[in-house]
Amino acid sequence: MILKQQDITQQKPFVDASVTTTWTIDLHYPEKPACACDAFQSVAKQLRISPYPIPYRCLYSRNIDNLMMAGRNISVTHVALGTVRVQRTTGMMGEVLGMAASLCKKHDCTPREVYRQHLDELIAIMTEGVPTRRVTPSGRTIGASE
């Protein structure tokens, strides 16, 4: 799935809503060539939005079975990228993909199969959030000590 400007501005609901972002659609364009200003100057155009969720389906590859992405390489259009590209949002993508990776390991499945077969479980983990202490699949305890 490719997230588009219309999905954002029309607040399209997604069953696999994963990361919520509130950043404006923030697009930067170079100054007109006739500008006598610094060559690296640009013009920013910002379109305010309401908070919206990025679908989990934007965070894995459509043609490479075991590839997940967090950051500027997710499945979005140029305009939609203007709002998902900030560090706080990309960091949250990483958290969601860590959760999805744990389900891939647990169920011996691909990221796409997490969406198709284990979405309720992923949503439950996302709702719980990132714990400070957890037991890994190998039985090791990680995180803050009590």
List each language-model region with its residue ranges.
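Flavin (FAD/FMN)-binding glycine-rich loop and adjacent Rossmann-like elements that form
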Residues: M1-E146
